[in-house]
Amino acid sequence: MLSAIPAAHMEFYENLQNYYVMAPYLCVHAGIHPQKSLQEQTEAELFWIRNKFIYSSHPLPYTILFGHTPQTDAFFDLPYKIGLDTGLVYGNKLTCLETEERILYQITRGKNTIKQIPIHEKWESSPRLTMP
């Protein structure tokens, strides 16, 4: 089965990082350990952490964009984090965030209509995330 995957694709996947910095955002799968620097984060924390991250603030200079923990809707705890896993696998919806325009895009499982949800007002009380 692996032999069917082109070598260039395998090289791409093998060189992926565990997180992606897109200032002022940090994109991770699950979250971060709230008491550690970015360099101290373990792979297990970036891929599996839940409650310790979700129920805490953190000192990093980023808003963390994360998934892994399904919610019924996008989760905002600004300026610290935005949860984008809205439970598609459980029959809910798929959500993504366009960071520059600050618009959520959502599509409900089994439907073919994409909702655009402006979320500019979420940033109004977060000085770290003011619009340019």
Predicted regions and their residues:
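Acidic, His/Gly-enriched loop-helix segments that form or flank divalent-metal centers
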Residues: M1-L94, T99-K115, I119-E121
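A short C-terminal boundary segment appended to hydrolase-like catalytic domains
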Residues: E124-P132
